Design a protein with these regions (language model features):
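Short acidic-hydrophobic surface loop/beta-edge motif
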Residues: 114-120
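Hydrophobic alpha-helical interaction segments
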Residues: 129-204
């Protein structure tokens, strides 16, 4: 069973127990096997229904990166895009802010409440229900519009505008996409797009 899990998911990669299939064995047998492997320390229970197989080297156990479970649970599970980072954490990711926030803000299809704080593996998350369903085709433009909705226009200099322009180019965001999704956002978003002059950097 352990060999099968390693071959299927690899080490230090989170996986859901619901993803496990093994020969013709029942889910009850799989649950019992996973519980037994947990007792032996062969796999680690991370969160509800989520586990990982510890990676070992000559120095011992390689630390697990908690961002992997956050990515899998709220951002992207294999090819299924279901969320994006936002707020101060996104500003930090883009280099617009140099201060790493203690809270990671995320919009995700897996959150049904307007706003909720949770802790996962020592990471504090502020989760939001998205304005519309997120998928691989609209995640980038929705992320961009959330960025512009929350941005302080007066703090934007040319360097920061360039960082936003780079994000637009890298994600191939177009004015056509913005026109499609801007109705989901408050008037402030459109106002910030114009006042910051960022809208003029978005291709047709």
């Amino acid at each position: 069973m352990l060999k099968h899990l390693i071959e299927t998911f690899g080490c230090n990669q989170p996986f859901a127990i619901s993803e496990i299939t093994y020969k013709d064995y029942s889910q009850i047998w799989i649950y019992k096997s996973v519980a037994e492997l947990c007792k032996k320390g062969e796999i680690v229970h991370l969160d509800r229904g989520v586990y990982y197989i510890p990676k070992k080297n000559k120095y011992g156990i390689v630390p697990f990166d908690p961002m992997k479970i956050i990515e899998k649970k709220y951002i992207k599970d294999n090819e299924n895009v279901q969320g994006f980072y936002s707020g101060k954490y996104l500003l930090y990711q883009l280099g617009i802010s140099k201060v790493q926030p203690k809270t990671i803000e995320i919009y995700s299809n897996n959150e049904t409440q307007r706003s909720k704080v949770v802790n996962i593996c020592g990471k504090r998350l502020l989760l939001h229900k998205p304005r519309t369903k997120i998928d691989k085709f609209n995640a980038s433009v929705l992320c961009f519009l959330e960025l512009m909705n929350g941005i302080d226009v007066e703090t934007l200099d040319e360097y920061k505008r360039k960082l936003i322009t780079d994000y637009i180019a890298e994600n191939r965001i177009t004015q056509r996409q913005i026109t499609k999704y801007i109705p989901y956002f408050p008037d402030k978003t459109c106002r910030n797009l114009i006042e910051s002059e960022v809208i003029y950097r978005v291709p047709q």
